[in-house]
Amino acid sequence: MKFNIAKKGGVVAQLVFEEKIEGGYLNHLKEKELFSGKAEDVYYTLDSNLKAQLFIGLGKEEKIDLEVLRKTFFKAASELLKNKVEEVELNIPKLNNLCNYKTAEAIAEGMLHATYKYDKFKSDRKEQTEITVNYNPEKGKEDRAEKGINEAVKLMEAVFLTRDLVNQPANVIYPETLAKIAKEKLEAKGVKVTVHGKKEIEALKMEAFLNVARASTKEPKLIVMEYYNNPGSNEKIALVGKGLTYDSGGYAIKPATSMVDMFTDMGGSGTVIGAMHALADLKAKVNVVAVVASCENMISGDGYRNGDIIGSMSGKTIEIINTDAEGRLTLADAVYYATNNLGATKLIDLATLTGACVSALGEQVSGAVTNNDEFFSELVKANERAGEIVWRMPTIEYYKKMNESKVADLKNSGGKLGGMMTAGLFVGSFLAKEDIPWIHIDIAGTAYITEKFGYLKENATGTLVKSLYYMLSKEA
């Protein structure tokens, strides 16, 4: 999809507010129940002269917001693609209280979402129509609109990178290839990427991470990404992503039906890599480090077992209650490394961690636990800008006690109750200093969805790449 600013040509889209359908052809369409003007209502047709017409409903004028624009223009672009339209003209007036910059960004984002396809393994895949969008904003606001569109294009490139990583199967994306792609994609944008193999991980004494990786023939990789673009600041924010490229459950083996999509268990690492891509590509004024401890959780004669007691980089010991509660073990060492060795002053970890989160919040809302109200409020503000939802869960002492072991410092499963909170608090207990502002985000339901929602097609979503960019770049 190509965007031009202040240019005419192509099918002229007619933008219609629901309350302004009065008489004439639009009223005829409404009576025939072909077009109502409601948000997300799009109608494409040919007139008697075979001239294409495109009607885009915006709903009630006072209710329009960025998410309405994303969903509506996703529908519009989908209709254009279906009808193989190559050029469209959008004449966008000032909308409600939205600035031209954010309006253009949301419209472009929605349209770009419609272009995403995951069909690389299909032998009969077809070429998609390349659409040219001639975008005409309010007069005098061309520069602001162009900035918004350029930001959307780069953000969506990062989101699509995340979606591609998460969608690909475990025989294609495993620790070595994940590290290779991260290095290729991010170094091209100015991010320093260091990949540590098994020997370096052993030297770091990352025992929790190594125990999870033991049974796999794929060598574990510790992927460290560094982006420094704010020399005047002492703040260094860490992003830590769960990097399980396949999770069989280990000896606490999953049922066959639950294993089918476990190549997506590296969703946290995909989000982190995508966020780093966006931050660097858009030259955000921020210092960010990112850490991914990537491995597979498999079964072999050398695999770790329920009942084992293992160490960790922090020195804390862990009783293994369940080998399928492995993600928090890899995160434990990664979080400690980020805060102790890299000196992160704040940290966000993201993981497809618990089924409990999916049961509680479904596929449209991510769950979170945090130790810092102010830090979390920054995320909420970014979520609002991005159209993404993260719901904060309680962190009362009761949940912390559930992680205590009688034979070790901690156990890796707090039991059946409060599973999302106990898992998150387990991860947080490996901060090098307990007062480091920290947010744990469980994206088990949102990283990979089973049903289409709004402008997100089923499968990988790229969730929270946008929110992390807005939050860390202070663009929210």
Curated annotation (Swiss-Prot):
Gene Ontology, cellular component aspect: cytoplasm
InterPro entries: Leucine_aapep/pepB, Macro_dom-like, Peptidase_M17_C, Peptidase_M17_leu_NH2_pept, Peptidase_M17_N
Keyword Iron-sulfur: no
Pfam family for this entry, one: Peptidase_M17_N
Residues that bind Mn(2+) 1: 247, 324, 326
MF GO annotations: manganese ion binding; metalloaminopeptidase activity
An example Gene Ontology biological process: proteolysis
Transmembrane segments: none
Origin superkingdom: Bacteria
Catalytic site positions: 254, 328
Keyword entries, A-Z: Aminopeptidase, Cytoplasm, Hydrolase, Manganese, Metal-binding, Protease
Annotated compartments: Cytoplasm
Cofactor binding description: Binds 2 manganese ions per subunit.
Cofactor: Mn(2+)
Chain residues that bind Mn(2+) 2: 242, 247, 265, 326
Reactions catalysed, as given in the entry: Release of an N-terminal amino acid, Xaa-|-Yaa-, in which Xaa is preferably Leu, but may be other amino acids including Pro although not Arg or Lys, and Yaa may be Pro. Amino acid amides and methyl esters are also readily hydrolyzed, but rates on arylamides are exceedingly low; Release of an N-terminal amino acid, preferentially leucine, but not glutamic or aspartic acids
Its EC number(s): 3.4.11.1, 3.4.11.10
Function: Presumably involved in the processing and regular turnover of intracellular proteins. Catalyzes the removal of unsubstituted N-terminal amino acids from various peptides.
Family matches, as PANTHER family: CYTOSOL AMINOPEPTIDASE (PTHR11963:SF23), LEUCINE AMINOPEPTIDASE-RELATED (PTHR11963)
Family indicated by similarity: Belongs to the peptidase M17 family.
Identification of the protein by name: Probable cytosol aminopeptidase
Species per Swiss-Prot/TrEMBL record: Treponema denticola (strain ATCC 35405 / DSM 14222 / CIP 103919 / JCM 8153 / KCTC 15104)
Gene symbol of the encoding locus: pepA
